[in-house]
């Protein structure tokens, strides 16, 4: 078969597929209208840079996991706030029945516009998620958490009954069903997950996430979030130092990390990140405990500079813009980069 005959045969096959399944069901990759991946900011400047595309990708599955009280829900609430700022409609499937509306509001979430569901079973939660995603009107959906997606058979059974891998089977089936809808509707789907310990592990990390292996395969981005220290004002703890690691990334190079502060009652400290990244990129000068911008001293001590940037949003936005511009040109901004990861 000559090249011309091959081209004609392919064109005829493509026309037949489009006739059967609709226009856009098959195409050459270069013909796709959106080659660039759209994203939504995470609310953390450092994490946006670590993800490589300025946030989490649209139309993909995201998994955020970590130990208890590490900031998983805080990060997802910031994601919702950022999506709503862009005019997006968001939904929150609260399988843990633990969402605090007052805290969500403090983080910038418009709770009047947030769709919330508190399902009774894992099947109900995932069916609700599927219906919302298929509607095409939802820009972001959060499922909190995979561990709380309890199968109906387990809820209706007796305490102590052996339910062999029922949750893993449920997740595997649901993700097979959801993936195509998520991509077609461009909906960001975020699963919050918890960590468990594997018994009898001699080598490597004993940590694993709940719900089987399906989510690890289907997720385009997996973010590991950990609390690494406390922030104190004299003796009072006012926040936590947090480290995030992008352990899987299908849209940019993975294994990058970012550090930020989560302040109690107000969430991720944007000003703290601007200072740290500004110093790393030589936008802010640091001499001893003094910080300067454009050769003008802006404060002594990190907490004082954070307050200065809060009081002067124009300068804060100016430095943030410079950080984003400079970080896109610099391949290494002293972010740690891991070479391997344990599930």
From Swiss-Prot:
SUPFAM superfamilies: P-loop containing nucleoside triphosphate hydrolases (SSF52540), RecA protein, C-terminal domain (SSF54752). InterPro entries: AAA+_ATPase (IPR003593), DNA_recomb/repair_RecA (IPR013765), DNA_recomb/repair_RecA_CS (IPR020584), P-loop_NTPase (IPR027417), RecA-like_C (IPR049261), RecA-like_N (IPR049428), RecA_ATP-bd (IPR020588), RecA_C_sf (IPR023400). Pfam families: RecA, RecA_C. ATP binds at residues 66-73. It is found in: Cytoplasm. Gene3D superfamilies: P-loop containing nucleotide triphosphate hydrolases. The keyword DNA damage applies. Disulfide bonds: none annotated. Its main location: cytoplasm. GO terms for cellular component: cytosol. One of its GO terms (biological process) is SOS response. Keywords: ATP-binding, Cytoplasm, DNA damage, DNA recombination, DNA repair, DNA-binding, Nucleotide-binding, SOS response. One of its GO terms (molecular function) is damaged DNA binding. Belongs to the RecA family. Can catalyze the hydrolysis of ATP in the presence of single-stranded DNA, the ATP-dependent uptake of single-stranded DNA by duplex DNA, and the ATP-dependent hybridization of homologous single-stranded DNAs. It interacts with LexA causing its activation and leading to its autocatalytic cleavage. This is Protein RecA.
